[in-house]
Amino acid sequence: MSLFRSTMLRRQLLTSRSVCLRYSSTSTPENVVLPRLQADLKNAMRSKNKPALNTIRAIQAEIINASKTAKPITTDSALYSLIQKQIKSSSASIEEFRNAKREDLVEKEQAQLDVLQGYSGEIPTVGESEIDELVKSALEGLEEGKRSAGHVMGRVMSSIKGRAVDSEYVSKKIQEVVGAK
């Protein structure tokens, strides 16, 4: 091996070690579902559970696609928003299949929806009562001129940052409170 190559290898090993070390960390919520997806995929393969297998593969494909963008899915809160998006898409598909009288596809999509809802229920989210309190405190902290839905939403979402939350409920609650005042 040449001197240049051995020096480059040593340099790469030293730099990669320093990047991987973490001396302190912020308190982020523990991932529950994300690390378990691979094991669930293997279990679905062993038990020949087609709906779970297809759903987990679709989730993993979305995670891989997102890893190639600026916002990779590395936490359960990001996974929660992905799953909610897929639940919404699946629900719309079920309605379309019902309108087309395709009960076979409705059953297939419903089985996938059940798997998605199972994963969605396992991820800890911000409760509705906490969201209500955050909306009220954000509204009280703003001046009269800046009490628009956008300003309140910005404050609420910045205080929830890093945690899984039902964005539709937050938006609905902000519209109620801002519209009432």
Curated annotation (Swiss-Prot):
Compartments in which it is found: Mitochondrion
Q: Where is the transit peptide?
A: 1-23
User: Which molecular function GO terms apply here?
Assistant: carbon-nitrogen ligase activity, with glutamine as amido-N-donor
Which top-rank group of organisms is this from?
Eukaryota
Cellular component, GO annotation: mitochondrion
Keywords of the record, alphabetical order, are: Mitochondrion, Transit peptide
Provide an example Pfam family for this protein: YqeY
Keyword Metal-binding found? no
**Family assignment from sequence similarity:** Belongs to the AIM41 family.
Protein known as: Altered inheritance of mitochondria protein 41, mitochondrial
